[in-house]
UniProtKB/Swiss-Prot annotation:
Regulator of protein phosphatase 1 (PP1) required for neural tube and optic fissure closure, and enteric neural crest cell (ENCCs) migration during development. Acts as an activator of PP1 by interacting with PPP1CA and preventing phosphorylation of PPP1CA at 'Thr-320'. During neural tube closure, localizes to the ventral neural tube and activates PP1, leading to down-regulate cell proliferation within cranial neural tissue and the neural retina. Residues 163-173, 342-362 have a biased composition (Pro residues). The modification Phosphothreonine is found at residues 358, 432. This is Phosphatase and actin regulator 4. It comes from Pongo abelii. Residues 508-518 have a biased composition (Acidic residues). GO terms for molecular function: actin binding; protein phosphatase 1 binding; protein phosphatase activator activity. The gene is PHACTR4. Belongs to the phosphatase and actin regulator family.
Length: 702
């Protein structure tokens, strides 16, 4: 008896094992055990099995949720929350081993000594992420990192990561694919990008330590950038005049300043560099959100419509950048990611989301020289076809890369944004007032450069290049606005960006992803709940209309209403109906037998009035005679027909109680016997009967 239960209680054993052990224990013979506990097994095993099944399901679901969350959460944020422990070895790794640093537990972790200071990362991060990331991006990163080996470890590491993706496109997890695409495009655009590289390299000279790395980085940046509108790559060069014009350069600068630990990209970006870029941008824009800002990723090469890239870049611009908006013509497009040359400290793309760290970057590093303007036609036209080809892929990549952004859904503009920006720069137009921060979808793009912003928006109107601005209210937005470091951004519009509109399904995915970046404990929400929480005002309006339509659909149809109400008919119709009813009634009445038939069948007696009166008179006479012949009471008593006494017994009301519980209302057995006897005597004497039939006259048994 003891063994089977003990075995059944052991959680480690599988249900099948439990059965086997129950049946074949060491102590008793298997056959005996089987017969003995077959009933017990029926009672307990289903419960045990059910319990184990539920736990298996729970494990599976928890694994899936963990996988999703780990894919969504930037490592730096997880470290902040204490979910992950920071790897102490990371800081010590030399640039030669970028691949290891990039993929810790499948997460691309930025390489750099500065990062070691960031919160501890847990090795428990699901290894599944590693499978998600593709090996190709890692190899690319290694190559790029290797090129920067001359720089100090921190610089070299930070720069390579930044380099692969131009600052405009902080890539998200899809980066692996987007990265490959960007490389392929980079080859195509290398010719066009050559000018940008040259400019970047020249400007880089200001930073002696990072010059070699910067040049190589600039090249890589151009390669990755070329897929995206050329203008950005070109602006990057101007920006590099202060040694960090290109995104890669900006990252290099942070390396010099150890106090700012670069955020650890826990993003799905296989490219740590891209992850870093995105995180650095986020750190400036959204302190709460480590995930990269909407800035389009270069990783989305062609996929990232120029609008994405420029918008993303814009989000990172600081107020000082906006002052210089007018000065940057071409540079402004690339600069959006690179903080435009601004005396005030631009948002270091390399910097982790924490606001305090952003200030350390010298404003100088991000100054961009606007004078260098590249003909808009140069790379733009070459890259436009590629981008349009890849627009198909945009939705997915955008989702992945923008996953951290709370305010995402927007439309894919018919014309690439970089072209629009180019047009806006070329055609000076009055500056339109920027929308308030409440307009979530209004991009910083429109606020980064005055002429730039107005031009782009007005061009959208005049040339029917729709930049649709949607107000997307996400729960995290208000928190982010409150937490945004004042030094990094003076305007509320920080979290806003213009993004190509995505298909509805992609939008929902993005919203789910952005939800993962919210501060606080990770809450597992149902998909329905998430959708509801992110419904915009427009969605609510549509929903209201839908519900109204549903209610209207539920209204009874006209034929149904006619069934329950008298339809309005003309007089002729009424007469026709009346005639039909009359015909049916006549037909029914015609089926009744006639009086003649009834008389023949003796059912109806033929009578006239005289006969009836005579009948009545006869009845009356007969009755009166009977009454006159009625015997009196005395006669009846004398003839013993009436046997009761001629007195009436009267009782007081209080004495007469019909309630059954009173003793005087109950007949005693003697009373009952007397009643039976009297009745029997009356019945027997009521009528003369033969002796043999006498027993039939008994009314009650005595």
């Amino acid at each position: 008896m003891e063994d089977p239960f003990e075995e059944a209680d052991q959680p480690a054993t599988e249900p099948g094992m439990v059965m086997d052990s129950v049946e074949a224990g060491d102590t008793t013979p298997p056959t005996k055990r089987k017969s003995k506990f077959s009933g017990v097994g029926k009672i307990f095993k289903p419960w045990k099995w059910r319990k184990k099944k539920s736990s298996d399901k729970f494990k599976e679901t928890s694994e899936v949720l963990e996988r999703k969350i780990s894919m969504r959460k930037p490592r730096e944020e997880l470290v902040k929350r204490g979910v992950l422990l920071e790897d102490p070895e990371q800081g010590g790794e030399d640039p030669g081993k970028p691949s290891h640093a990039m993929l810790k537990n499948g997460h691309t972790t930025p390489i750099g000594n500065a990062r070691s200071s960031s919160p501890v990362q847990v090795e428990e991060e699901p290894v599944r992420l590693a499978s998600l990331r593709k090996a190709i991006p890692e190899e690319d990163l290694k190559k790029r990192l290797g090129s920067t080996g001359s720089q100090p470890n921190s610089e070299a590491e930070s720069v390579p990561e930044n380099v692969p993706k131009p600052p405009l496109l902080p890539p998200k997890r899809p980066l692996s694919s987007s990265h490959e695409a960007s490389e392929g495009q980079a080859k195509d655009a290398t010719s066009s990008g050559g000018t940008a590289r040259f400019i970047i390299s020249t400007s880089i000279t200001t930073a002696p330590a990072a010059t070699t790395a910067a040049t190589s980085l600039a090249k890589t940046v151009n390669l990755s950038v070329t897929p995206s509108p050329a203008p950005r790559t070109l602006p990057a060069a101007p920006a590099s005049t202060n040694t960090t014009a290109t995104p890669s350069l900006t990252h290099m600068v942070p390396a010099k300043q150890p106090p700012i630990p670069p955020p650890k990209p826990a993003h799905r970006n296989s490219n740590p560099v891209i992850a870093e870029l995105s995180q650095a941008i986020n750190s400036g824009t959204l302190l709460s959100k480590p995930s990269p800002p909407l800035p389009p990723k270069r990783g989305i090469p062609s996929t990232s419509v120029p609008t994405l890239e420029s918008a993303a870049a814009i989000t990172t611009k600081t107020p000082s950048d906006e002052r210089e908006k007018s000065t940057c013509s071409m540079g402004s497009e690339l600069l959006p990611m690179i903080s435009p040359r601004s005396p005030s400290p631009p948002l270091p793309t390399h910097i982790p989301p924490e606001p305090p760290r952003t200030p350390p970057f010298p404003a100088k590093t991000f100054q961009v020289v606007p004078e260098i303007q590249f003909p808009p036609s140069l790379d733009l036209h070459q890259e436009i076809p590629q981008q349009e080809d890849q627009k198909k892929e945009v939705p997915k990549r955008i989702l992945d890369q923008n996953f951290g952004e709370p305010h995402i859904p927007s439309r894919l503009p018919p014309l690439p944004l970089h072209i629009r920006i180019q047009q806006a720069l070329t055609s000076p137009l009055p500056v339109t007032p920027t929308l308030e921060g409440s307009h979530r979808a209004h991009s910083l793009l429109f606020e980064n450069s005055d002429s730039f912003s107005e031009d782009s928006s007005t061009l959208g109107r005049t040339r029917s290049l729709p930049i649709t601005i949607e107000m997307l209210k996400v729960p995290d937005d208000e928190e982010e606005e409150e937490q945004i470091c004042p030094s990094t951004f003076s305007e509320e519009t920080t979290p806003t960006s213009v993004i190509p509109k995505l298909p509805q399904c992609l939008r929902e995915e993005e919203e789910k992803e952005s939800d993962s970046d919210s501060e606080g404990p990770i809450q597992y929400r149902d998909e329905e709940d998430e959708d509801e929480s992110y419904q915009s005002a427009l969605a609510n309006k549509v929903k209201r209309k839908d519900t109204l339509a549903m209610k209207l659909n539920h209204r009874p149809s006209e034929p149904e209403l006619n069934l329950n109400s008298w339809p309005c008919k003309s007089k002729e119709e009424w007469n026709e109906i009346r005639h039909q009813i009359g015909n049916t009634l006549i037909r029914r009445l015609s089926q009744r037998p006639t009086p003649e038939e009834l008389e023949q069948r003796n059912i109806l007696q033929p009578k006239n009035e005289a006969d009836r009166q005579a009948e009545k008179r006869e009845i009356k006479r007969r009755l009166t005679r009977k009454l006159s012949q009625r015997p009196t009471v005395a006669e009846l008593l004398a003839r013993k027909i009436l046997r009761f006494n001629e007195y009436v017994e009267v009782t007081d009301a209080q004495d007469y109680d019909r309630r059954a519980d009173k003793p005087w209302t109950k007949l005693t057995p003697a009373d009952k016997a007397a009643i039976r006897k009297e009745l029997n005597e009356f019945k027997s004497s009521e009528m003369e009967v033969h002796e043999e039939s006498k027993h039939f006259t008994r009314y009650h048994r005595p």
